[in-house]
Amino acid sequence: MKHLPQLEGVSVGLEGEAVSLFWGEIKEEERQEIYECAKALVPWRKGPFWVGDFLIDSEWVSAKKYALLEPHFDLCNKDVADIGCNNGYYMFRMWGQKPKSLTGFDPSPLCRTQFDFINHFIQAPIRFELLGVEHLEGYGKLFDVIFCLGVLYHRSDPIQTLKSLYKGLAKGGELLLDTLMIEGEEEVALTPKDRYAKMSNVYFIPTFKALSHWLHRAGFERVEKLEIAKTGLDEQRKTEWINSQSLEDFLDPCSHDRTIEGYPAPRRIYVKAYKGA
């Protein structure tokens, strides 16, 4: 990272699917340094990013989730946090809405380094904290809007996690959350025995009704269902920018409606929860 060139005249595009960084002519050795640095930071899970003339084609086409959520939030002049922010893709997109402040929480050093790589060129006023959701309530700052995307099912105590999110919100604040879910009208959650889609850190996958009750127990005043979407191979797939398996390897080869373990295939629910004023 210390050897990345300092480029002048960098233009930033935040409106398309990719977070895009463009500049004029640079020396070939500078371009190669930038490319090799990006390649050294695999796997790139979230994105995509255009970096000059090459595309970091991440495992997840994160623009799909952002496009689904964007009609449901207004970040202008608000204090915003992204919990489990990964490499900052969503935060760079959010920056375009001119929030008052933007803070990401993620304990992964690799994610922080990827963020630093991209922000070396963008120079966005975004804070990245090497912290988890459990540090939110003691952080010393309350947020108007908190995003928590793809985190809850990795937590062994989901209600405590939701309580931490609640305590991190200012009065009248909003939580935008997505999590794996199962279909059904009962107040239940799937608890995988060992693994779900080859992941050993998936603990509880609720119905919408169970998730609503968790949020109620955490203190939220109201819960709004935004969308339910099945994860497809057009959204999560292998690319040259990851060094591991992806969704196709996690599903039953005979039926993509089930995981390799026989559980229902990944389906996500997106909700908005409100803290009382």
Curated annotation (Swiss-Prot):
Its EC number is 2.5.1.-. The gene is cmoB. This is tRNA U34 carboxymethyltransferase. InterPro entries: CmoB, Mo5U34_MeTrfas-like, SAM-dependent_MTases_sf. The keyword Nucleotide-binding does not apply. One of its GO terms (molecular function) is transferase activity, transferring alkyl or aryl (other than methyl) groups. CDD domains: AdoMet_MTases. Catalyzes carboxymethyl transfer from carboxy-S-adenosyl-L-methionine (Cx-SAM) to 5-hydroxyuridine (ho5U) to form 5-carboxymethoxyuridine (cmo5U) at position 34 in tRNAs.
